Amino acid sequence: MVLIFGGAYQGKLTWAVQQYGLCADELCDLAHGFLPGKRCYYHLEALTRAAEEPVSPSLFPADAVLIAREVGSGVVPVDAADRAWRERHGALLRQLAGQARTVVRIFCGLPQTLKS
């Protein structure tokens, strides 16, 4: 598994497509729902926002490329539902990072490998 994360509009998907040679039919935009059997899943934050319970890392294939937005950056949301989502999303990212063979942070389109 590969985990790619970073802020909004930092070039995460573009970098992943180039780095891993991904085609459009291998991508699943989780903002529009989950499709099994894809090679790359992006917008993990949309999946954790829609879920009422924690998302299990086992939902994704072991060789998947997963792309997630950093949320919060230390800012605590005023709304309780937003705080709960931020906590669910952060917990999922910690679990995925622990299981992933590679973890990359993208900032301004530049990759920073945290784990390989």
Task: Mark where each language-model region is.
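Residues at the C-termini of beta-strands that transition into short coil/loop
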Residues: 31, 45, 107-109
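Conserved P-loop NTPase "ATPase switch" module shared by AAA+ and STAND
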Residues: 36-50, 66-68
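A short acidic, often aromatic-flanked loop/helix-cap motif at beta-alpha or helix-coil junctions
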Residues: 32-36, 111-114
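Glycine-rich P-loop/Walker A and Walker A-like loops and their local beta1-loop-alpha1 context
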Residues: 1-30
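Histidine (H) residue identity feature
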Residues: 32, 41-43, 89
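Flexible, charged surface loops at secondary-structure boundaries
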Residues: 21-22, 33-39, 58-62
